[in-house]
């Protein structure tokens, strides 16, 4: 028998609990990727003119299959079309100076904090008031100006001593790392393509984040930095390639050993990783992490390199992502890697597969969904109390349909059930029909859930 869950009431209670607990977290270490986001809202006429000018046939080639990196203008425009056609996000490194100059001249509508670390530092430190220590590969004046006020710190050496200071107090003069983000709304039309939902394509004009450049303070004094945290969130491994991944992955492994020795729970925030060799290396690293966060494209890409091509196809063939295929993928991932917590987010619903059991897992997911809805609605969250506004956003129909499937299959009760030795947690999310922006929503979801779950436990 299917019972109707009172999700609105659960949302409100979860928010009350997290508001009371979240500031108890004493510190979060965030590494490694921070940059500047230059956001351009795409216009049909402008994009079509650009496509015609460089040659439509050549551009369309790349709308079928993404290149590994961007070396030409047709590759840039074709990759943007790839995202529009599927309503899926993608990010590629722009290696050519000519294409970087083309993007700079194309311009932007707004500049924002970018990179998973930068976005999470502003949210956790600037909005939630939790002390964070952020890795910033290049602290230019513009980069520093994008950090919010609050307990956000970067390590620096002073007379051989390690000090933590706000990024705006840092010595200036380093380079700008700019990622150009091409945003499109749902039903955006270009040529004969129509976007099934809002999303974006990212072209990275950046010589530091893509090679996982790590600052000397973080190489020489990592243990000292880590001791000032209770939790760690690691991100930024996704642009690495078969040619350059050896040294950075080795360093990440060393950092994880220190975190594990100190008993600090580390979460990996996954992002789409085009290089399959690197993707497999990241899967091997998962046994050193407590937790991982990913969406349907990322999950499919992971199970694919684990040898499950047909399962990968099933995960992404439907919209919203097929929950039965997703759970099969999550189960494979948790069993084969030994990670203790997986948080899956997609349009309409979130799932968690965890060794830990309890309502706090669901409450953390609900809080993170409110944070995401608020960010989508407002473009930015300025203070913790803003998240109450997310309560007014309606729950999406897609998620409620998925709930019926999962209740039948796994006997969920108020979103909680079990599968083998794990707790399976489900929530339907609140869906903003016309979001102001989609950038950073995944990072908002994962960091809010990971940190609030820890604070509630």
Curated annotation (Swiss-Prot):
Biological or metabolic pathway of the protein: Carbohydrate degradation; glycolysis
Compartments, record wording: Cytoplasm
Binding site for ADP: 295, 345-346, 432, 442
Names of required cofactors: Mg(2+)
Keyword Cytoplasm appears in the UniProt entry: yes
Enzyme class name: transferase
GO CC annotation: cytoplasm
Active site: 443 (proton acceptor)
Primary location: cytoplasm
Alphabetized GO MF terms: ADP-specific glucokinase activity; glucokinase activity; magnesium ion binding
Reaction(s) this enzyme catalyzes, per UniProt: D-glucose + ADP = D-glucose 6-phosphate + AMP + H(+); D-glucosamine + ADP = D-glucosamine 6-phosphate + AMP + H(+)
GO biological process, one term: glycolytic process
All copies of domain ADPK, residue ranges: 5-457
Positions contributing to D-glucose binding: 37, 91, 115-116, 179, 443
Regulation of its function: Inhibited by 8-bromoadenosine phosphate (8-Br-AMP).
Entry binding sites for Mg(2+): 269, 298, 443
UniProt KW keywords: Carbohydrate metabolism, Cytoplasm, Glucose metabolism, Glycolysis, Kinase, Magnesium, Metal-binding, Transferase
EC number assigned by the record: 2.7.1.-, 2.7.1.147
Pfam families: ADP_PFK_GK
Cofactor note text: Binds 1 Mg(2+) ion per subunit.
Family named by the database record: Belongs to the ADP-dependent glucokinase family.
Main function: Catalyzes the ADP-dependent phosphorylation of D-glucose to D-glucose 6-phosphate and glucosamine to glucosamine 6-phosphate.
Name of the protein in its database record: ADP-dependent glucose/glucosamine kinase
Organism: Pyrococcus horikoshii (strain ATCC 700860 / DSM 12428 / JCM 9974 / NBRC 100139 / OT-3)
Gene: glkA
């Amino acid at each position: 028998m299917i019972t109707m869950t009172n999700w609105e009431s659960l949302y409100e209670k979860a928010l009350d609990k997290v508001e009371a607990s979240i500031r108890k977290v004493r510190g979060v270490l965030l590494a490694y990727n921070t940059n500047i986001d230059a956001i351009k809202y795409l216009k049909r006429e402008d994009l079509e003119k650009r496509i015609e000018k460089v040659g439509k046939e050549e551009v369309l080639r790349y709308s079928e299959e993404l290149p590994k990196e961007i070396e030409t203008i047709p590759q840039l425009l074709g990759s943007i079309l790839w995202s529009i056609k599927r309503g899926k996000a993608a990010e590629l490194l722009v290696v050519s100076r000519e294409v970087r100059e083309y993007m700079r001249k194309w311009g932007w509508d707004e500049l924002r904090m970018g990179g998973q670390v930068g976005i999470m530092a502003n949210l956790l430190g600037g909005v939630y008031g939790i002390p964070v220590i952020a890795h910033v590969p290049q602290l230019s004046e513009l980069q520093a100006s994008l950090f919010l006020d609050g307990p956000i710190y970067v390590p620096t050496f002073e007379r051989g001593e390690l000090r933590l200071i706000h990024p705006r107090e840092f010595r200036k003069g380093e380079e700008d790392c700019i990622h150009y983000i091409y945003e499109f709304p749902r039903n955006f039309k270009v040529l004969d393509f129509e976007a099934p939902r809002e999303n974006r394509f990212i072209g990275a004009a950046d010589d530091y984040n893509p090679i996982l450049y790590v600052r000397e303070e973080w190489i020489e004094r990592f243990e000292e930095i880590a001791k000032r945290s209770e939790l760690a969130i690691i991100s930024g491994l996704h642009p690495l390639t078969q040619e350059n991944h050896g040294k950075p992955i080795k360093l990440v492994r060393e950092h994880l050993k220190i975190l594990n020795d100190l008993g600090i729970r580390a979460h990996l925030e996954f992002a789409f990783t085009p290089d399959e060799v690197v993707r497999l290396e990241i899967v091997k690293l998962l046994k050193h992490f407590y937790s991982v966060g990913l969406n349907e494209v990322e999950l499919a890409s992971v199970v694919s390199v684990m040898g499950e091509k047909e399962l990968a196809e099933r995960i992404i063939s439907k919209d919203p992502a097929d929950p039965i295929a997703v759970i099969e993928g999550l189960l494979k991932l948790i069993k084969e890697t030994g990670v203790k917590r997986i948080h899956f987010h997609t349009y309409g619903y979130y799932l968690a597969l965890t060794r830990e059991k309890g309502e706090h897992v669901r409450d953390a997911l609900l809080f993170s969904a409110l944070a995401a809805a608020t960010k989508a609605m407002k473009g930015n969250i300025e203070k913790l109390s803003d998240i109450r506004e997310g309560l007014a956003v309606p729950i999406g129909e897609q998620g409620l349909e998925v709930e019926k499937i999962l209740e039948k299959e796994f006997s969920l009760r108020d979103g909680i059930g079990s599968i083998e030795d794990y707790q399976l947690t489900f929530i339907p999310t609140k869906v903003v029909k016309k979001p102001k922006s989609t950038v950073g929503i995944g990072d908002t979801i994962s960091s809010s859930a990971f940190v609030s779950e820890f604070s509630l436990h």
